[in-house]
Every structure is written in structure tokens, then in C-alpha cells.
Curated annotation (Swiss-Prot):
Organism: Xanthomonas axonopodis pv. citri (strain 306)
Main location: cytoplasm
Region of interest: Repeat 2: 83-146
CDD domains: AAA, RecA-like_ClpB_Hsp104-like
Coiled coil feature spans: 391-523
Short name of any one Pfam family annotated for the protein: Clp_N
Protein name: Chaperone protein ClpB
Region (NBD1): 159-340
InterPro entries: AAA+_ATPase, ATPase_AAA_core, Chaperonin_ClpB, Clp_ATPase_C, Clp_N_dom_sf, Clp_R_dom, ClpA/B, ClpA/B_CS1
Length: 861
């Protein structure tokens, strides 16, 4: 017999049989070796063939093992391996059967058929396991589907649907799919398209996360439950696994061969299978090589002839990018648009899924948590779609509660660490012999005993609480399983089983659940098993950095005392601080307009009066870090072409992929303070971009993505009108301030357009600084120097007279507080640096700074 006339699978089986014989020290290859090798082949057709023919495969394996054990062993004869007479005879019979059926290559199933009525030990083992020649022959006919073997790889192309698709109807039947709530209109539209005579291939198009795949799963569930028109009853929905189809296709044409086998199997089923291709755009260009056809082109004839009943799913962008370009492929599909569900629909979807997630995590998900997940995700997570983002919120919040249940509570952990510390101290004190150490040891023993009792009580409490929670989890799982069995019995119309579950098993389990709930108190001290709205808000805060969780008492007090906190860093400017504080309080109390930024201000005033410093202080107050402020120097945007840098370059320009300077910063940190410094120096076109930010709290970047500015505070600073402020300064009365503000506003209105000024929440005019305020600023600025000296082990001591000197030297009504910084450098830092370097001051010394005749004198204390 020519080996090249065997299929590749059969050749591989003979090679494996030879290897098996060598491993068992057999010098003759027998038929049992070959069948054992065929059964062990991964992805082979022998096992499913025998199972279909009613053969008990585990028993057959057992009998084959016994037959192999009875074969004689010969050691030291590994090179003298030969084919036995029984195997030779069987192979000839196999060749004969293949020729009778018109096969060009000999397939492994004819070997199994030849063995069925053979007198060899293999035939005996096969018949003992239930092998019958007629049944095996019928199974072969079903497996081959009337086709002959015309290629070496023919066996590998069999059962293509089992290998390269996932049966969604089977998953729905076994209860592995999540329930699909709502989406009735889209499912009805999909069924409507599937029922058409031609072009009966719907393609579901929608944004990522709106539930396109869920619609197909919903269709599979409806088919299983018989809730579909007559034309779709009994059909199967198979999902094409593109990964399995491409994986391992090493040679050119292998991918096409697999896809052809899938299409061939589908045509054999004569419309009884609906193929679901998720991410349909991957078919365009898949398997494409030089001059080769891609998968999309291979699908076209089958779609046109109606042999392929297909549902596609893809996103809007990818449909436009890949499918619309191929008009011949596009016309064979009928578009079904899947929109984002409303918040109310999302709440209904979450209520349907709640039970599955609660059972998986072993926690209780409350209804307020579901409402919070839908509303908060819609309000704060703007770059993703409902219901996906709301489901993720619920899932992560439940996961967090589960993790807290499984891990040791913080209180218990702290006690354990304290005990370890005390025990280490006890071991050290045992080595000491003096009376004081013995006394300390006795005190320590008392403390350890007390802590150990406390730890034991808490540990027992934790274990009992945890056990109570686990009890309810098991009952919930049993209820879920019983409901799935009830649905399966309903489909089979097994009324006896339905009655048993509905009136026996389920009431019993619900009674157990009620008892478990009585034991389980929700006011547990250490563990909490309920997901509430607070947990959902906590997850949103972690995702976005926006503080949407319930305010703690400490934070409320801090917000009420906000003006005092800001005055620690900004001297004077009461009006500006009040305006900014009110805006932040409105936002945190949830009273500000949800479709506009939390606050938008224009700070006006001469240089050095604290405009930028107030922004830094505000960022520090809100985010505990001045780094959280997005600072953009508007003098960088003086030219017209530089405006695009704020939102990103348009398509076709260099830097398109990088995104915008402003938009990318806000996308990464949606809760932030944006400082547009020296705004009057920017090109007028910048203000056109800012109009929609100030009005609608949104901005579209160069890539077409909408960036949310609703949680930002926007502050613009400007020196416009500083000349008028200087002229009218000196009078602290309210009338003088009103007159000054009117003069400044005249300059502002002449420079900025009315539509820009009209969109701002407030325009604040900063007061020029007086001598007393400069002295207070000097005290604040010297705190930084004191901190730096403290790192070197030195202490700084300045009296009021020295501060007066610094204030008078650093006071300049035109330049504000900036000359003060230079005065501190020249009067304090420079002489002090020289004296430290010369060794006059060492670590631990105190530096006294005193005034003497208008100059500062340094002495060591």
C-alpha cells in the first residue's frame, strides 16, 4: 500500500501507532495500536464517529488497554519494528472500501469499518464496546454527507462547524447566556430581516457597548423558548470564531480551505443554521495575501445565493471604514441600527442581570445601587456607552464588596500587627535582668493578654459573619440552578419535572433563604454584603477622579471654611475668593447647571496681585496638589495656526494622532481646574473655541471625540485695565472700587467680544496690594525658606521689625508682590547662603534676623 494515498490524519495515526509500540516494547504494530492512536488524536473524527454509532468509547479504551497489555514485549529490538499480518490485512480491506466508495485518498473511518467484523483482538474489543457494522456505516454516511475524499486534508475539514463556531442556542439552552432585557424592537427588526426572501442578512451597527452581541443572544434565547415566527423555529444560531479559523493556518490557502469547509457545512444544513459574525469588519481583508481572495470575497457568492443565513455586528466607524468601501459586500446586508438605551431602559436591563451578578459575587445588589449605576455612569463616564458602562460599574462594586468579605478586615489586621510588635518586644525584654525591665515585661504580658482576647473575639465574630454570608450564597446558587432546570423542563414539556421544581424544590429553597436571611443581619460589624449607591459612587470616583461619593462630615466643614483656607495663601482679594468658593460649593452640593462647567471666571488686575496664586491655592484645596491644575500659557497661542494645538491637528496634518493640548489633558483628568494665563495675549480665534466650552461644557477635538468640561473650573487671567487700576488705586472706599471696576470693564469690553463676556459666570477685578498686605505675604513666602532651612537642621527667627524692612524694600504698587520675592532673595537668602557655606551656621543652630537702621543683621542664637 502506498503511504501517500492515505489522508494526513491517517498517516499521523500510523506514525503515532509506531511510537506507541516502541514505548511499550512491542516489535510488531497491531491494529489495536492504530485504533488507540486514532482515539487519542486531537480534533480527529474517530471519537465522534464511534459515539454517534452508539459505541461506549470509555469501555473501548479500557478493552484496547487490556489488549495492548497482552501483547508480548521484546526488549533491545527497537530497530526491528514491523507491521503485523492482522494490520496488513486490515489496511488492504481499508484500501478496498475506499476504492468502492470512489475516494481518491484512504480515510481513517474505513479502517474502523473494516475492523468492525474482523476476527482480530481489535474487532473483539470493538464489538464488546457496542460496535455494530451497520451502525458504523450509517454514522460514516452522516459524517461525510454524501461527499468523497478527494484531498489529503479532507478529514481536517470535517466537523468544521464544531471546530470553528460556538453554538449560541446550545449555550442558551444550558443557561450560560445572560438574560436579555428590553431591545424588543431591535430583535423584532432582526427577525423581520431574517424572514426576507433575499438579502435576509441583517448587520447590527452601533457604538461599542450598546448591546449588539446581546441582541443575537436574545434571538438565540427566543428560538429556544419558541418565541419566534414559524420560519425560525428549530434553527440554530452559531457564532463564527475567527480566532480558531485563523489560528494555526500556516500555509497559503489553509485559511481559505477552513472557511470553505464552514460554508460547505452550512449549505448542507439547508438554511437550518444562522451564522453570527461578530466584528464583521474582520472578514474584510482576513487571509488576504498577494493575489489571494479575502474572507469577505469568499462570503459574497454564498450570501448572494442565499446559502448563507448570516447576522453581522460591527461598530459605526468600522462599518464605514471597511464594509461601505466594498459596495458588493455592503448590498448583501441589511443595516439594523442599535442605539444607546436610555437611563430608564438601562435600569431595567440591570434589574434583569442583577441576580446573575449577585450569585456570581455572593453579595446582595440593592435597587438604589442599580439606579445609581445607570445615572452616575450616564452623567460622569462620557466616553463610553450605556448599558456596558453601567454593568461594569455594578460588577466592579460587587467585586470590591466580595474582596472585602474574603480578605481580613482592617480592624482585625491592625490588632494582629500590634500583637506581633508586642511579642517581639517581650522576647527582647526576657533577655534583660534588671528590675525595671522585669516590671515592663509584666506590664507587657498584661497588654498582650488583653489584646489576644480582643483579637480572638473579633476573629470569631468575623468567622461567624462570613459563614452566615456564605450560607445565603449557596442557597442563591441552588435557586438559580433550579430556575434554569425549570426553564429546560418547560421547553421539553416535562410537566412532572416542572411540578416537582415549582411546587417542591423552589418553595423549599426559598424557605431556606428566608431562614438564612433571618440569621444574616445586615448591620454586621466587620463585613458588609450589600452593594449600595455609596459603593457605586466610590467606583465612579476611582475611575474618573470626580468626587461623586457622599460627602463626609470633614469635607463639608472644609467646604464651609473654604475662604479661610484660601486666605492662608492669598492675602486680600476677598471678593475673588468669595466668588470662587461659592462656585465650588454650588458644584459639590449638586446645584450648579449640569450642562456647564462648575465655574468660569475672568480674573483682572495688575501684575503680582495673586491671580495665578489664587488658582494654585484653589487646585491645592480641591485636589491636595497644585499639579492637578491644567495651566495653559495663552501667550503660546498668539498666531492663528497655533490655535489647532488646543484641540488637536485636523486629519491629514502632522500631529493628528497626538490629540489636543487642552482636550487630552481634560480627557485624562475630567475633574480639574483649567488656568488660561494671560488670556488677552491669545489669538482672537481661541475665543471661538472657548464659546462652546463655556456654554455647553463640551468640546469636540480634532479626532471627532467629544470632551466633557462639565466638571472643570475654568479660570482666565488677564492684565487688561491694569493702567486704570493703578490710576484709581489709593482709595479703599466701595465707590472708588465700583468706579475702578467700571473703567476696567470698559477696556475688557473693547478687547473681548460680547458673546464671550456674556458666557462667563463672573469677572473679578483684583485690588492692588498695600504695604500691610505685602508684610503678610512676606510672612507666607518666608515659610518656604523656613522649611528649606529645617531640612538642613537650621531654624529661622525673624521679628516684626525685620518683616517691616522686607515689606518696605519689597513694596512696589505697580509690580505687586513680585518685587518682594526679589527682596527676600537679596536681603535674606544671599547673605545667609554665604554664611552657611563659610561654616558660621551648623546643623542645630538658630538664625536670628533683626533690623538695624533699615538693614537686616544675622546672629547665631
Amino acid at each position: 500500500m502506498r503511504m501517500d494515498k492515505l489522508t494526513s490524519r491517517f498517516q499521523q495515526a500510523l506514525a503515532d501507532a509506531q511510537s506507541l509500540a516502541v514505548g511499550r516494547d512491542h516489535n510488531i504494530i497491531e491494529p489495536v495500536h492504530v485504533l488507540a492512536a486514532l482515539l487519542d488524536q486531537s480534533g480527529g473524527s474517530t471519537r465522534p464517529l464511534l459515539s454517534q454509532a452508539g459505541v461506549n468509547v470509555p469501555l473501548l479504551r479500557e478493552r484496547l488497554g487490556e489488549a495492548l497489555d497482552t501483547l508480548p514485549k521484546v526488549s533491545g529490538q527497537e530497530g526491528n519494528l514491523s507491521i503485523g499480518n492482522d494490520l496488513n490485512r486490515l489496511l488492504n480491506q481499508t484500501d478496498k472500501l475506499a476504492q468502492q466508495h470512489g475516494d481518491a485518498f484512504i480515510a481513517s473511518e474505513w479502517f474502523v469499518l473494516a475492523a468492525a467484523d474482523d476476527a482480530s483482538p481489535l474487532g473483539v474489543a470493538l464489538r464488546a464496546a457496542g460496535g455494530d457494522k451497520k451502525k458504523i456505516e450509517a454514522a460514516i454516511d452522516k459524517l461525510r454527507g454524501g461527499e468523497t475524499v478527494q484531498s489529503e486534508n479532507a478529514e481536517e475539514q470535517r466537523q468544521a462547524l464544531e471546530k470553528y463556531t460556538i453554538d449560541l442556542t446550545a449555550r442558551a439552552e444550558s443557561g450560560k447566556l445572560d438574560p436579555v432585557i428590553g431591545r424588543d424592537e431591535e430583535i423584532r427588526r432582526t427577525i423581520q430581516v431574517l424572514q426576507r426572501r433575499t438579502k435576509n442578512n441583517p448587520v447590527l451597527i452601533g457604538e461599542p457597548g450598546v448591546g449588539k452581541t446581546a441582541i443575537v443572544e436574545g434571538l438565540a434565547q427566543r428560538i429556544i423558548n419558541g418565541e419566534v415566527p414559524e420560519g425560525l423555529r428549530g434553527k440554530r444560531v452559531l457564532s463564527l470564531d475567527m480566532g480558531a479559523l485563523i489560528a494555526g493556518a500556516k500555509f497559503r490557502g489553509e485559511f481559505e480551505e477552513r472557511l470553505k469547509a464552514v460554508l460547505s457545512d452550512l449549505s448542507k444544513n439547508e438554511g437550518q443554521i444562522i451564522l453570527f459574525i461578530d466584528e464583521l469588519h474582520t472578514m474584510v481583508g482576513a487571509g488576504k495575501a498577494d493575489g489571494a481572495m479575502d474572507a469577505g470575497n469568499m462570503l459574497k457568492p454564498a450570501l448572494a445565493r442565499g446559502e448563507l443565513h448570516c447576522i453581522g455586528a460591527t461598530t459605526l466607524d468600522e462599518y464605514r471604514k471597511y464594509i461601505e468601501k466594498d459596495a458588493a459586500l455592503e448590498r448583501r446586508f441589511q443595516k439594523v441600527f442599535v442605539g444607546e438605551p436610555t437611563v430608564e431602559d438601562t435600569i431595567a436591563i440591570l434589574r434583569g442581570l442583577k441576580e446573575r451578578y449577585a450569585v456570581h459575587h455572593g453579595v446582595e445588589i440593592t435597587d438604589p445601587a442599580i439606579v445609581a449605576a445607570a445615572t452616575l455612569s450616564n452623567r460622569y463616564i462620557t466616553d463610553r456607552q450605556l448599558p456596558d458602562k453601567a454593568i461594569d460599574l455594578m460588577d466592579e462594586a460587587a467585586s470590591r464588596i466580595r474582596m472585602e468579605i474574603d480578605s481580613k478586615p482592617e480592624e482585625l489586621d491592625r490588632l494582629e500587627r500590634r500583637l506581633i510588635q508586642l511579642k517581639i518586644q517581650r522576647e527582647m525584654l526576657k533577655k534583660e535582668k534588671d528590675d525595671a525591665s522585669r516590671q515592663r515585661l509584666a506590664d507587657l504580658e498584661t497588654d498582650i493578654d488583653k489584646l489576644e482576647r480582643e483579637f480572638y473575639d473579633l476573629n470569631e465574630l468575623w468567622k461567624s459573619e462570613k459563614a452566615a454570608l456564605q450560607g445565603t450564597t449557596k442557597v442563591k446558587e441552588q435557586i438559580e440552578h433550579a430556575k434554569l432546570e425549570l426553564e429546560a423542563a418547560q421547553r421539553r414539556q416535562d410537566y412532572a419535572k416542572m411540578s416537582e421544581i415549582q411546587y417542591g424544590v423552589l418553595p423549599q429553597l426559598e424557605k431556606q433563604m428566608a431562614l438564612a436571611n433571618e440569621v444574616e443581619h445586615h448591620d454586621f460589624k466587620l463585613v458588609q454584603d450589600r452593594v449600595t449607591a455609596e459603593e457605586i459612587a466610590e467606583v465612579v470616583s476611582r475611575w474618573t477622579g470626580i468626587p461623586v461619593n457622599k460627602m463626609l462630615e470633614g469635607e463639608r466643614d472644609k467646604l464651609l471654611r473654604m475662604e479661610d483656607e484660601l486666605h492662608h495663601r492669598v492675602v486680600g482679594q476677598n471678593e475673588a475668593i468669595k466668588v470662587v468658593s461659592d462656585a465650588v460649593r454650588r458644584s459639590r452640593a449638586g446645584l450648579s447647571d449640569p450642562n456647564r462647567p462648575s465655574g468660569s471666571f475672568l480674573f483682572l488686575g495688575p501684575t503680582g496681585v495673586g491671580k495665578t496664586e489664587l488658582c494654585k491655592a484653589l487646585a491645592d484645596f480641591l485636589f491636595d496638589s497644585t499639579e492637578a491644575m491644567i495651566r495653559i500659557d495663552m501667550s503660546e497661542f498668539m498666531e492663528k495656526h497655533s490655535v489647532a494645538r488646543l484641540i488637536g491637528a485636523p486629519p491629514g496634518y502632522v500631529g493628528y494622532e497626538e490629540g489636543g493640548y487642552l482636550t487630552e489633558a481634560v480627557r485624562r483628568r475630567p475633574y480639574s481646574l483649567i488656568l488660561l494665563d494671560e488670556v488677552e495675549k491669545a489669538h482672537p480665534d481661541v475665543f471661538n473655541i472657548l464659546l462652546q466650552v463655556l456654554d455647553d461644557g463640551r468640546l469636540t477635538d480634532g479626532q471627532g471625540r467629544t470632551v466633557d468640561f462639565r466638571n472643570t473650573v475654568i479660570v482666565m487671567t488677564s492684565n487688561l485695565g491694569s493702567h486704570q487700576i493703578q490710576e484709581l488705586s489709593g482709595d479703599d472706599s466701595a465707590e472708588a472700587y465700583t468706579q475702578m471696576k467700571a473703567a476696567v470693564m470698559g477696556v475688557v469690553q473693547a478687547h473681548f467680544r460680547p458673546e464671550f463676556i456674556n458666557r462667563l459666570d463672573d469677572i473679578v477685578v483684583f485690588h492692588p496690594l498695600d504695604k500691610a498686605q505685602i508684610k503678610s505675604i512676606a510672612r507666607i513666602q518666608l515659610q518656604g525658606l523656613e522649611k528649606r532651612l529645617a531640612e538642613r537642621g537650621l531654624k529661622l527667627d525673624l521679628d516684626d521689625a525685620a518683616l517691616e524692612v522686607l515689606g518696605s524694600v519689597g513694596f512696589d504698587p505697580v509690580y505687586g508682590a513680585r518685587p518682594l520675592k526679589r527682596a527676600i532673595q537679596s536681603q535674606v537668602e544671599n547673605p545667609l547662603a554665604q554664611q552657611i557655606l563659610s561654616g558660621q551656621y551648623l546643623s542645630g543652630d538658630s538664625v536670628r534676623v533683626r533690623a538695624d537702621g533699615g538693614r537686616l543683621v544675622f546672629t547665631k542664637d
